[in-house]
A protein has these predicted regions:
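Aromatic- and glycine-rich beta-strand/loop motifs that create alpha-glucan
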Residues: 1-23
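Helix-capping/transition residues at the boundaries of transmembrane alpha-helices
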Residues: 15, 76, 87-89, 155, ...
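Short cytosolic juxtamembrane segments of multi-pass membrane proteins
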Residues: 254-258
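Hydrophobic/aromatic residues in alpha-helical transmembrane segments
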Residues: 64-71, 84, 119, 154, ...
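Helix-loop-helix units of permease transmembrane domains in multi-pass membrane transporters
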Residues: 9, 74-106, 252
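Terminal transmembrane helical anchor/hairpin motif
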Residues: 2, 35, 42-45, 49, ...
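Secretory targeting signals
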Residues: 30-74, 98-166, 182, 187, ...
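Hydrophobic core positions of alpha-helical segments in small-molecule transporters
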Residues: 24, 28, 99-100, 170-173
């Protein structure tokens, strides 16, 4: 089983890493991050802080674009090409296919995120000569990478039962909602309606809370996210992402390709 998952992961990595659109997005992202060096000179304030803020935001935005674009095509592309029949005709179970595809794309996103983080590190180093801020760039980028893995899992889930366009819409919607989930508890606490309070609590636990991976502010202000926060983010990814992948595998097992 593990060998088959690893084989599918390796093939997925090779396919995604050769994607010309991926290179176009990555090249544009690296260019924007590199230009933060010049944008900072046009701004008033702490130049190193501005570079870190714009740079990490660029990694985040372009990472999400790559995760959503590649994630929604993981399953639908194989179905459209009819290669899914060839793959499943071999001794490959459907859940192995989903896990292998997701893990392979996660490796690709890891390499692209690392590349963008290194460029930002070098640009930022021009203003701050080493220290906590530079280390924090990689930690914040790790948080972004965890978020991208979760978004990939969600995109894979949606692609098992709907079209690529709808998968992209649903995934981007959850990306936006995932960064305001914390406000649901605030709305519920302030409401006088018991139904609204219960509903807000249910939605709070059902919807993804992507703020668990948001460690950018610590870096912008010259610090590093505390260790318990990092551990909680990783635990949340494993638990929530694992549940999403299990649901994806369950839906894909029941999918009819005829």
């Amino acid at each position: 089983m593990y060998r088959r998952i690893l084989c599918i992961s390796a093939n997925t990595f090779r396919e995604t890493i050769r994607n010309k659109i991926l290179y176009a997005i990555l090249a544009f992202a690296l260019m924007v991050i590199g230009l933060t060096f010049f944008l900072a000179d046009l701004s008033v304030g702490d130049l190193a802080r501005i570079i870190a803020d714009i740079g990490l935001a660029s990694i985040h935005v372009f990472g999400v674009i790559m995760a959503v674009f590649l994630g929604i095509t993981l399953v639908n592309q194989e179905i459209d090409r009819k290669t899914i029949y060839l793959i499943l005709s071999r001794p490959v179970r459907r859940f192995e296919f989903i896990l292998g595809k997701t893990f392979g794309l996660s490796v690709t996103l890891g390499l692209t995120t690392a590349a963008m983080a290194v460029v930002l590190f070098l640009v930022h180093l021009g203003y701050r000569y080493g220290g906590r801020a530079e280390a924090g760039i990689f930690i914040a980028s790790a948080g972004i990478y965890m978020e991208l893995i979760l978004l990939t899992s969600l995109a894979t889930l949606f692609s098992t039962f709907t079209t690529s366009v709808l998968s992209a819409i649903f995934t981007l919607s959850l990306f936006i909602v995932g960064h305001v989930t914390n406000y649901l508890t605030t709305v519920g606490d302030r409401s006088k309606s018991a139904g609204l309070r219960i509903g807000s609590q249910v939605l709070y636990y059902l919807l993804p809370n992507l703020e668990h991976f948001n460690w950018k502010n610590d870096v912008v202000y010259g610090g590093i996210a505390p260790l318990p926060l990092l551990g909680w983010g990783l635990a949340y990814l494993v638990c929530y992402g694992g549940c999403v992948l299990c649901l994806s595998c369950l839906l894909f097992e029941r999918k009819d390709f005829k």
